[in-house]
A protein has these predicted regions:
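Beta-strand/loop-rich accessory regions of lumenal/periplasmic or secreted enzymes
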Residues: 482-677, 681
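Extracytoplasmic
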Residues: 106, 145, 250, 293, ...
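Active-site lumenal/periplasmic loops and adjacent helix-entry segments of GT-C-fold
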Residues: 11-154, 397, 401-406, 429, ...
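Membrane-interface helix-loop-helix junctions at transmembrane boundaries of multi-pass membrane enzymes
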Residues: 2-9, 167-168, 207-223, 281-312, ...
Length: 756
């Protein structure tokens, strides 16, 4: 179908789409007041490290400080904008990213027009890119260097197809952009090279048969341009290469960090069906080349085919022992796939409009074809933004995505400013993912953030994230690889303790049951007067911990006017059970009648003999409570999420109640199998296959002292305020509607019980 739109009108519409793209993206970014995305804080911490310390390879704030392997091209450009204009980082960063994201619209238009001389495909491609969900998500989660790098790759591929530019100018532009790309984003550089190097080889192969001198020169010109680009970036590459090698030696990218490897496999693997589906547009470009240009293997068809297939196949690189966030590789496929859809739509419109000649008088064919093309194009442009197609995000979906990635509003940013102004410059913070990245970036304080391992890369970040997640959630963790026991300590009645069982279906252990000190109740007589005491109501006296090569345990003692209460939690290194004992010592003229436990369970309860089982079919795990010498009366509540244990004591002497709580992976959901498994479980039965069996112990007091943590900051909607308010080791220093900040009282940590 011949061109139906004049070049000047076509370019005017493309500029209008570019303008629309800017306005739409600005609206999404400003919809939350502050730009959405945790990575905005990360980028600002890199900018501050460059401006204040002049260091490209170290981030002095992010994840407690350490190596920074985020290439600084975007950050240097943005810091120049900030210094030149005086605008803050949270304004400069998204503005730069919005500009480059919108330039992708023009790149889509120019690439499609240059590659295939079709009437409306370039405009459809530009419109689709303007509303591309994947590009918008990348902008809204703060992947600004990714946005810039993808735009540069599109611009580079456009230069590859420009044959009317002088060789000298082409080499200059390609080498400059290649060098800039290397300086901006490492993963994009790697994908770019994996596309370009096969392209050079294929061009060499097919240029031998070509009679055109330009075709024979192109591989050499492209190879020279890439080489010059590397020479431009060589000083940076020489400086950053040792840092890469050192971190790769520690397991980065090669699966050496087990936590990252497991999390990536469980959450970031791209389905093979999606990879196979991407082959359709990849090889279709060759078919389009045959129809619209003649030969099958033209430069344009080879380029677009490689552009689609290479990133898709790279998502399966875990087969070869290479690990990264594989979903990010899918962003490289978006542009060629959208161009494919635009070409397909143009082809379909042309096919339908040509069909009207069978239904129309000869003198009206051109007029009717034009009307049909206009109607069908309008329908496509209406369907894209207002449909629920997963590749596009109209206004409704766009604002939903922006809200999903929203991290800070005015109250949160007020707290960040307070941190910057009111805390020592060397104070170390612990915070949650997202908000914590803003604390490090805009509060300019070293911050350990509780980020999930699949979103981390550099080895030192994993321990920092694990420490932060644990400190915000629990005070003590006892983990032997089979079970994990968490306890909030004696100041806060919530999980006292919680038992989690390792699951095959999750990277995190699955919570199966927990007790609460406020629901462990002692019924007793003081003289002739009946009384009731919840364990949490008895003042905490001391917390002691003990570690050996075989086990770890926590001992908490409480004293009331009538009773002394001691709770002991012990985990052995190769057992699937935790020993929980409670000793109640009545004082003079006091006798204990009953002790009641409420056990919260996460699954179906099964009771027989001296044991209670808890089966969670979704997680494929089973928990178990085994009673000691005395067997309580067991009552299941109607909602089946709680079990009541009542011990009939009737004694004025010391009382000791022993429970073994544990769990195991259920290989079958068959009722007979489960009952047999529960009946055969003993303390020593479950063993770790590895000879390296050990028990890991997390003590919040020791960790905070060792790492010199000064403040805990978190959103009130994310973590318990009461957990820190009740603990004398923390002092509330800032509170608003959204955020709480606690100062760590080091002296209180040292005074509390014994550590280790």
């Amino acid at each position: 179908m011949k061109k139906s739109i004049s070049a000047s009108l076509e370019e005017l519409i493309a500029l209008m789409l570019f303008t629309f793209s800017i306005i739409y993206r600005v609206s999404l970014v400003l919809s939350c007041g502050y730009p959405p995305g945790p990575d905005v804080g990360l980028h600002n911490s890199i900018i501050n490290s460059i401006i204040l310390h002049g260091d490209f390879l170290r981030n002095y704030y992010h994840m407690g400080g350490g190596y920074s392997l985020t290439h600084p091209g975007f950050h240097i450009f943005t810091s120049s904008v900030m210094l030149a204009t005086g605008i803050p980082g949270y304004v400069a960063q998204p503005l730069v990213a919005i500009l480059f994201s919108s330039l992708m619209v023009l790149c889509a238009f120019l690439l499609t027009r240059r590659a295939w001389n079709m009437p409306i495909a370039p405009l459809i491609a530009a419109f689709m890119v303007a509303l591309s969900r994947y590009d918008l998500e990348m902008l809204l989660w703060g992947g600004y260097p990714n946005v810039v790098a993808l735009t540069m790759i599109s611009a580079l591929f456009y230069l590859f197809l420009m044959e009317d530019v002088s060789t000298k100018m082409s080499i200059t532009l390609i080498s400059f952009l290649t060098g800039t790309l290397i300086f901006t984003h490492s993963l994009s550089t790697l994908v770019y090279l994996c596309i370009v190097l096969p392209l050079i080889l294929l061009e060499l192969l097919f240029s031998v048969k070509s009679s055109k001198t330009k075709n024979r020169r192109f591989p050499a010109k492209l190879a020279l341009s890439i080489s010059l680009g590397f020479i431009i970036s060589l000083p940076f590459v020489i400086k950053v290469l040792p840092a890469y090698l050192e971190n790769i030696k520690m397991g980065m990218f090669v699966g050496g960090i087990e936590e990252n490897k497991e999390a990536t496999i469980l959450t970031r693997i791209v389905p093979i069906s999606l990879v196979l589906a991407s082959l359709i547009p990849g090889f279709s470009f060759i078919a389009f080349s045959k129809k619209y240009s003649g030969p099958l293997f033209l430069r344009v068809s080879l380029l677009f085919c490689l552009w689609t297939i290479v990133p898709a196949l790279a998502t399966q690189s875990f087969i070869f022992g290479l690990y990264t966030d594989f979903f990010r590789l899918m962003h490289f496929i978006v542009m060629p796939v959208l161009i494919f859809l635009a070409i397909f739509a143009d082809h379909g419109i042309g096919f339908i409009s040509r069909g009207v000649k069978f239904l129309t008088k000869p003198e009206n064919v051109k007029k009717v074809q034009c009307i049909f093309s206009l109607i069908l194009t309008t329908l496509i442009l209406l369907i894209v933004p207002f449909s629920s197609l997963p590749m596009f995000a109209g206004p409704s979906s766009g604002f939903t995505i922006a809200n999903y990635y929203h991290v800070v509003s005015s109250p949160e940013f007020q707290s960040v400013q307070w941190i910057k102004e009111k805390t020592p410059a060397d104070a170390i913070f612990v915070s949650e993912h997202g908000y914590g990245w803003w604390v490090s970036g805009f509060g300019e304080r070293p911050t350990l953030s509780g980020t999930d391992p699949q979103f981390l890369i550099i080895p030192h970040e994993f321990e920092a994230a694990r420490t932060s997640r644990t400190l915000l959630d629990s005070n003590f963790i006892l983990d032997n690889g089979l079970i994990e026991v968490r306890d909030d300590g004696g100041y806060f009645a919530r999980y006292n303790p919680m038992l989690l069982v390792k699951s095959e279906y999750s990277m995190n252990p699955h919570p199966i049951l927990y007790l609460n000190d406020s629901e462990i109740t002692v019924f007793y007589n003081a003289g002739q007067k009946p009384k009731i005491l919840d364990v949490s109501a008895a003042p905490l006296k001391d917390i002691y911990t003990k570690e050996t090569s075989e086990s770890v345990e926590i001992l908490m003692t409480r004293n009331s006017s009538d009773l002394g209460i001691t709770k002991n939690i012990r985990v052995i290194k190769d057992s699937g059970f935790c020993n929980l004992s409670i000793i109640i010592q009545p004082y003079d003229d006091v006798s204990v009648e009953y002790v009641r436990f409420i056990v919260h369970v996460n699954g179906k309860t099964l009771q027989f003999g001296r044991t209670v089982g808890i089966l969670n079919e979704d997680a494929g795990v089973c928990g178990q409570i085994i009673f000691g010498d005395s067997i309580p009366t067991v009552r299941r509540f109607t909602d089946s999420q709680c079990v009541e244990l009542i011990y009939n004591i009737g004694s004025s002497g010391s009382i000791e109640i022993n429970l073994a709580i544990g769990g195991f992976i259920a290989k079958s959901m068959n009722e007979k199998y489960i009952y047999n498994a529960l009946a055969n479980m003993t303390y020593a039965r479950p063993k770790l296959a590895s000879e390296d069996a050990s028990v890991r112990f997390f003590d919040y007091r020791r960790v905070m002292l060792e790492k010199g943590i000064s403040f805990i900051a978190f959103k009130r909607s994310s973590y318990s305020l009461e957990k820190f308010m009740r603990n004398p080791a923390f002092q509330l220093v800032f509170l608003n509607d959204k955020v709480a900040i606690f100062k760590v009282r080091t002296s209180a940590l040292k005074e509390e019980g014994s550590i280790g």
